[in-house]
C-alpha cells in the first residue's frame, strides 16, 4: 500500500483550488449575463451553458518553492485566438500547502492566508461559493 506524501497531496489540493476558482468565474459570468437582455448576452450565456465559451480559467505553474496560481484569458485580439496568462491569483507553498496572497508577480505577501493541511480551510478553498475569482477573500481580516 503506497502512502501519498504531503507534497503530492498539496499539488492535488492546489489543482482542486484552481478548479474551484474557474467554477466561481463561470458562476459569476452566468449571473452577469442573466441580468442583461441583449442578444450578445444571450449568445454568451448559451455558449457558457453548452461549454463552448472561452472563459477565464486558473492554472497551476510550478516554481522552485511555490505553486503559482495564474489567471488565463483567451485572447482574440487581431485573430490571435490563444490562451494568455494574466495575473497571479495566489501562491501555494509546495511543501506545506500554505496559501499566500501575491505581493507581486514573483513573490507572495508576508502572511499565510489559508493552510490546506487544515481540513475546514481546505474545504472552503475548494468551494466555488467561498472563493472569489477576483481574490477578495485573500485579504487579511
What are these language model-derived features?
Residues 47-90:
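Exposed beta-strand-loop-beta-strand "reactive/processing" segments of non-cytosolic proteins
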Residues 4-5, 11, 109-110, 139-141:
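Long, terminal "pre-/pro-" and other extracytoplasmic accessory regions
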Residues 96-128:
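A short, surface-exposed interaction/processing loop segment used at functional sites
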Residues 30, 38, 100-102, 114-116, ...:
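Hydrophobic transmembrane signal anchors and adjacent membrane-proximal interface regions, especially
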Residues 2-59:
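Negatively charged, low-complexity tracts enriched in Asp/Glu with abundant Ser/Thr
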Residues 130-141:
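Cysteine/selenocysteine-centered motifs that mediate thiol-based redox chemistry or coordinate metal-sulfur cofactors
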Amino acid at each position: 500500500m503506497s502512502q501519498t506524501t504531503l507534497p503530492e497531496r498539496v499539488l492535488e489540493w492546489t489543482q482542486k483550488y484552481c478548479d474551484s476558482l474557474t467554477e466561481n468565474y463561470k458562476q459569476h459570468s452566468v449571473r452577469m449575463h442573466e441580468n442583461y437582455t441583449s442578444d450578445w448576452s444571450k449568445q454568451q450565456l448559451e455558449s457558457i451553458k453548452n461549454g463552448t465559451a472561452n472563459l477565464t480559467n486558473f492554472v497551476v505553474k510550478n516554481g522552485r518553492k511555490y505553486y503559482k496560481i495564474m489567471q488565463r484569458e483567451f485572447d482574440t485580439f487581431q485573430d490571435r485566438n490563444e490562451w494568455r496568462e494574466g495575473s497571479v491569483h495566489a501562491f501555494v507553498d509546495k511543501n506545506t500547502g500554505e496559501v499566500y496572497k501575491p505581493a507581486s508577480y514573483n513573490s507572495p505577501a508576508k502572511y499565510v492566508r489559508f493552510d490546506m493541511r487544515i481540513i475546514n480551510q481546505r474545504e472552503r478553498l475548494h468551494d466555488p461559493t467561498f472563493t472569489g475569482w477576483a481574490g477578495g477573500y485573500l485579504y487579511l481580516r
